[in-house]
Amino acid sequence: MKTSKVAIDASFLLKLFLPEDSSDQVEHQWRDWIENSVEVIAPTLIVFEASSVLRNKVFRGILDDADATEMIDRIRHLDLSLIYAQELIELAWGMGAILKAPTLYDCFYLAVAKLFKVPFWTSDKKLYKSAKKEFPFVNLL
């Protein structure tokens, strides 16, 4: 049984599949959560955003289509709880106003963490810098 939760965003998730700075730390953190029965949660948006990033990398010739397709299949089978709740819309909207954000994509990730009162992990330095002061549950890896 899962005893605790953490929330993640697409930048964190994609580092499990794409070799980038801090990918090793992200993989280590993910394994630690799974081994310790931590439930990893994210808004359903994460699947769309991660798939879109991979598609863009294929389009730009950075990734092979077959490799990207395999990554998407692996994402689909991850031990990741996808969250959709009506409350997310209102929370994300309010967080967007606080952060003066032009879009709400990142705010939906923050809203999941706020709704479930759990730590939020991102690999997006810009998001971390803009949100950490207002939302101390935000962590960067």
Regions found by a protein language model. Give the residues of each.
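Acidic, PIN/NYN-like endoribonuclease modules and their adjacent C-terminal/linker elements
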Residues: 1-5, 98, 110-141
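Short, well-structured N-terminal submotif of metal-dependent ribonuclease cores
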Residues: 1-45, 57-70
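Short beta-strand scaffold positions
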Residues: 8, 41-42, 83, 104-107, ...
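Alpha-helix capping/helix-boundary segments
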Residues: 12-13, 46, 87-88, 108-109, ...
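Phosphate- and divalent-cation-binding pockets in alpha/beta enzyme and binding domains
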Residues: 25, 49, 91, 129-130
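Acidic catalytic patch
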Residues: 44, 67-99
